[in-house]
Amino acid sequence: MGDSSVTKRWAKASATIQAAANKLLWDDRAKLYRDNETTTLMPQDGNVWAIVSGLADTPSKKKQISAALAKRWGKFGATSIENRNYVSPFIGSVELWAHGIAGDNDAMLKLIRLQWGFMLNDPRMTNSTFIEGYDGNGVLTWPGYPYDQRVSHAHGWATGPTSALTLYTAGLQILSAGGKTWRIAPGLANLSRAEAGFQTSLGKFSVSTKKGSRGEVKVSFSTPAGTSGEVWIPKPNCKAMLSLGCKGQKSRNLPMWDKGYPGSTDQYLVVDNIPAGNWQAEVKCVH
């Protein structure tokens, strides 16, 4: 709304809450947050939101929470121990985002195949839409509903894979309003290719990524005029060179073993200040 007068006050309150939660609620043995100071319950919803909201204060905690949640999965999906071990595709969708934010794209894809695969393939389903929720044993009931047929079989809150695959597998992310700034950060895990795209008030965004057997990557992406962003390229299992080029501009060749680029890590080469255009980034092993 353009009102920044209370920004500092709320930022301070947020930091205070984060510090208190990490001091009082983090269980270092379980690698999860407790629901409150008076219980041993470590809920699915609270822990996935700890990652998504930024309450988890280190990258290692995010990875630990992601791994601990994955250990809880049942035969039909991610159960909510705080909700009588029912499976909630709503909070399960948020769990997908949490795995993506934590950098565990493999866990994200496994949960999609497990939980949403069940919803698509079970003969009691529509085989084209997603259900509101169900018992952890696969029975199609939901707490508070006296009749089984009351469960919605076309439920908007169960559509998390759409955004999760766009944001963390294809890696098409907008960082500010309308996509004025953006990030391309593909995370294919065990997939060989991914594509995504959408349109905002500023124009069309799209990305297409293909991966070779040794981790070689070819990323083509397009962003609208007046925007800028950054590209995160996963480093392959070889000594590699990144070629980054845009239609109408001279290509750049960057050694992927060089950490001299701002924001680069052992896993990613990060190139920032990229203007809008039709770009292609290609990673090739040099030996």
Where are these regions (language model features)?
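Non-catalytic C-terminal accessory modules of carbohydrate-active enzymes
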Residues: 19, 106-287
